[in-house]
Amino acid sequence: MSHTQIIGFAGHKQSGKNTACNFILATKLAELGVSKSTRLTDLGEIEVTDILDETVSGQEWMPFKPPHVDVESLFDNELGKFVKIYSFAQKLKQLCVDVLGLDKDFVFGNDQQKNTKTHIKWDNIKSSTKNKGYMTVREILQYVGTDMFRGLDPTIWVNACINQIKKEQPELALVSDVRFENEVKAIQNEGGYVIGLTRSPFKEPKKDHVSETAPAQCLDICDMVIDNASLSIPEQNEQIYLAIKHLNNIPDIIV
């Protein structure tokens, strides 16, 4: 994977990982001429003035994924060779949709959607003694992804993501959900970098599942850590931009 540069972002839930990836993606959209102007909302989501000169009548800004534009095809055919956002949990989430029948919007949605109850009961899991009732989307993702599959092979989701990056070979691959130490090391072993983010909106991360506590250990082996605990989104973006410009092989990708 000689010509693909990987940058991963590590941190707790809602630490700013997705926002960081969106900032870099928005920067590339403007640089590549996909949009004349780009910005991030207060929620860290990308807005653009246009997509390849297509606009929405009466709107100065629109979401980067408007209903009238097939953004996935845009990445498959054009943008994907320059920059693409990946997730270690991508294959897991799609599996839970395809095999367990979970709602795709909830599986790939926000925290409120992930905390929604599903049709699957804790009672179906013979080894579960303390949990009762219906499982939430988040609980299923944690159980299937970590307790089941990582129990069989701790590198299963890492390998799936890295193999996809190698297959698609974008110029810049961004990984938005680094949580475990082996995920950090996998990116570094491919010549990539991992940037840790310190923000932790929840005073006490859940102690009953390793996926909620593992990010704290990740920060110790990241290539650099940005203390974004009290930074606004624009301030975080500035720190990320300055940090990336000092990484080897990155300045040629992010101008």
Which residues are covered by each model-predicted region?
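A glycine-rich beta-strand to alpha-helix segment
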Residues: A173-D177, N182-E183
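A conserved segment at the C-terminal end of the G1
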Residues: T19-L32
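Short catalytic-loop micro-motif centered on adjacent basic/acidic residues
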Residues: V83, A173-L174, D227
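Short His-Asn-centered micro-motif
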Residues: A10, F88, S176-V178
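ATP-dependent small-molecule kinase phosphotransfer cores
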Residues: R39-P170
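Pre-Walker A (Motif I) flank of P-loop NTPase domains
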Residues: S2-I7, E171
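Small-molecule kinase domains that catalyze NTP-dependent phosphoryl transfer to phosphate-bearing small molecules
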Residues: G8-S15, N22, T38-D42, I46-V48, ...
